[in-house]
């Protein structure tokens, strides 16, 4: 029984990895059909549906992975780092680095892979970005409590500016077919962001 569960879990992971790889390839800029995905995995469409009731559930699983990866690591940054600017820098670097290491998933983050899918999937990505923006806003607001002095600019505006930078770099990465890596020149770009944190 345990072997059967492990085999099923492995096949599910194989399907998700194949979907992520297809999103990374030129196929990712077009609608991915279950027929193409089944051929990529080397199984029938019926076999895909034994593991996932729909393609939407496959995307849901990839979005869950993205959410878990990013939110867990953001929480670790907040636990380990106390300096506000360092926290913000690490969160930005996390978002950009995650996108760079996972090009196929970046197509999901930017919404490109979801254009032909159910609207609720884009809604989940929107919620993820709202959660990240709320975390950034909280980090910015805690500066006053931690360091005795806040920012001259409203924290909501600063948080949206930081997140817009990240989203822009991820979109540029996808638009360039993964040529312009989000972390390229980060050490030169970060001071431009940090200069806004006054």
Swiss-Prot record:
<dbReference type="GO" id="GO:0043590">
    <property type="term" value="C:bacterial nucleoid"/>
</dbReference>
<keyword id="KW-0132">Cell division</keyword>
<feature type="coiled-coil region">
    <location>
        <begin position="117"/>
        <end position="144"/>
    </location>
</feature>
<comment type="subunit">
    <text>Homodimer. Interacts with FtsZ.</text>
</comment>
<comment type="similarity">
    <text>Belongs to the nucleoid occlusion factor SlmA family.</text>
</comment>
<keyword id="KW-0175">Coiled coil</keyword>
<dbReference type="GO" id="GO:0000976">
    <property type="term" value="F:transcription cis-regulatory region binding"/>
</dbReference>
<dbReference type="GO" id="GO:0003700">
    <property type="term" value="F:DNA-binding transcription factor activity"/>
</dbReference>
<dbReference type="GO" id="GO:0010974">
    <property type="term" value="P:negative regulation of division septum assembly"/>
</dbReference>
<dbReference type="GO" id="GO:0051301">
    <property type="term" value="P:cell division"/>
</dbReference>
<dbReference type="Pfam" id="PF00440">
    <property type="entry name" value="TetR_N"/>
</dbReference>
<feature type="DNA-binding region" description="H-T-H motif">
    <location>
        <begin position="33"/>
        <end position="52"/>
    </location>
</feature>
<dbReference type="InterPro" id="IPR050109">
    <property type="entry name" value="HTH-type_TetR-like_transc_reg"/>
</dbReference>
<dbReference type="GO" id="GO:0005737">
    <property type="term" value="C:cytoplasm"/>
</dbReference>
<dbReference type="InterPro" id="IPR009057">
    <property type="entry name" value="Homeodomain-like_sf"/>
</dbReference>
<dbReference type="InterPro" id="IPR054580">
    <property type="entry name" value="SlmA-like_C"/>
</dbReference>
<keyword id="KW-0131">Cell cycle</keyword>
<dbReference type="Pfam" id="PF22276">
    <property type="entry name" value="SlmA-like_C"/>
</dbReference>
<dbReference type="InterPro" id="IPR001647">
    <property type="entry name" value="HTH_TetR"/>
</dbReference>
<keyword id="KW-0963">Cytoplasm</keyword>
<comment type="function">
    <text>Required for nucleoid occlusion (NO) phenomenon, which prevents Z-ring formation and cell division over the nucleoid. Acts as a DNA-associated cell division inhibitor that binds simultaneously chromosomal DNA and FtsZ, and disrupts the assembly of FtsZ polymers. SlmA-DNA-binding sequences (SBS) are dispersed on non-Ter regions of the chromosome, preventing FtsZ polymerization at these regions.</text>
</comment>
<dbReference type="InterPro" id="IPR023772">
    <property type="entry name" value="DNA-bd_HTH_TetR-type_CS"/>
</dbReference>
<feature type="domain" description="HTH tetR-type">
    <location>
        <begin position="10"/>
        <end position="70"/>
    </location>
</feature>
<dbReference type="InterPro" id="IPR023769">
    <property type="entry name" value="NO_SlmA"/>
</dbReference>
<dbReference type="InterPro" id="IPR036271">
    <property type="entry name" value="Tet_transcr_reg_TetR-rel_C_sf"/>
</dbReference>
<keyword id="KW-0238">DNA-binding</keyword>
<protein>
    <recommendedName>
        <fullName>Nucleoid occlusion factor SlmA</fullName>
    </recommendedName>
</protein>
């Amino acid at each position: 029984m345990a072997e059967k569960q492990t085999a099923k879990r492995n096949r599910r992971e194989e399907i998700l990895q194949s979907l992520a790889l297809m999103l990374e390839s030129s196929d990712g800029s077009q609608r991915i059909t279950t027929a193409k995905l089944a051929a990529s995995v080397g199984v029938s469409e019926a076999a895909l549906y034994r593991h996932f009731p729909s393609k939407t559930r496959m995307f849901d699983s990839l979005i869950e992975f993205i959410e878990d990866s990013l939110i867990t690591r953001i929480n670790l940054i907040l636990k380990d780092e106390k300096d506000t600017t360092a926290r913000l820098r690490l969160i930005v670097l996390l978002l950009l680095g995650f996108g760079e290491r996972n090009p196929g998933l970046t197509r999901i983050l930017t919404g490109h892979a979801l254009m032909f899918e159910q609207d609720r999937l884009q809604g989940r990505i929107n919620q993820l970005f709202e959660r990240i923006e709320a975390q950034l806003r909280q980090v910015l607001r805690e500066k006053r409590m931690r360091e005795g002095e806040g920012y001259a600019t409203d924290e909501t505006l600063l948080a949206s500016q930081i997140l817009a930078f990240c989203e822009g770099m991820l979109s540029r990465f996808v638009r360039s077919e993964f040529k312009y890596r989000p972390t390229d020149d980060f050490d030169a770009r970060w001071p431009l962001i940090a200069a806004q944190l006054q």
